[in-house]
């Protein structure tokens, strides 16, 4: 991979005496990135690694600090940072410029992010019979005269003026959002009263998408002997029932179509708010330190990853920058007691 250009410019700002920070603009263009590129069946290999294309990353980073309160006994300050980034493919080889390059759940296409999902378009559950329905791909499932094959017609149904199919084989693919968040960053709160200090650090992300492959596996009724999600209790059972979980049966084609196929059904927002650290500390007073002949002593209790607000229980949206979550562990909760002494 080579860089064709890198630009970074930082500005320091001070709005009022107690509010200051920095604003930094950046832009980086890269070429000859490594990607797995699908090959024709006649080649004898499924994919090969190639140096292809150009990608541009640009955005702005903002870092602000504000002294809210400062008195003899009390001090309160807050800080926050935010990064806004835009990722875009600016050039592909001539042979791939029209149709792009499909790479697992993504599609490389000029004008789109390398982390933008390319997935079957899930519509929902047919309330009449519990079938899982996809938006029908008419463009690739008709002949030159615009006629649909009889085998395909049997899978079709019309809902709300839209032609749908109960087979993932005839589902329409489309761009479905990016794993790159609109904004991400963190903020902190620091409070002190006399000898006590309390500090917290949060991290957050807004606007990205994540393909929850772990949840897909838990909802797959075609797999026997595996753990299953309690959401399967919401499966369709009665005509007219409105639900987002298709009916459960032992038809292998039905199970494959609704469970094993990757689609926007398994795509969810990757927004999160994580309380990363909380620390409470006490600084021993001079009256005690002088007696035991110590310069300073500080006792602290801290906790990490106390909670995370997110779209779905068990999902860890920050585990994978590419936006695919599969058997990822949640951040472990850690508790620490510390003593710092200076002689």
Residue ranges of each PLM-predicted region?
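Surface-exposed, low-complexity loop segments enriched in small/polar and acidic residues
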Residues: 40-47, 101-106, 114, 118-122, ...
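Extracellular/periplasmic, surface-exposed regions of secreted and cell-surface proteins
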Residues: 1-114, 258, 262-343
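Short capping/connector residues at structural and topological boundaries
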Residues: 38-40, 44, 57, 97, ...
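Extracytoplasmic gating/loop element in the C-terminal half of outer-membrane beta-barrel translocons
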Residues: 205-297, 303
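Conserved small-residue
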Residues: 50, 67-177
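Glycine-rich, aromatic-lined ligand/substrate-binding cores of catalytic
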Residues: 176-212
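C-terminal extracellular loops and terminal segments
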Residues: 52, 56, 98-117, 177-186, ...
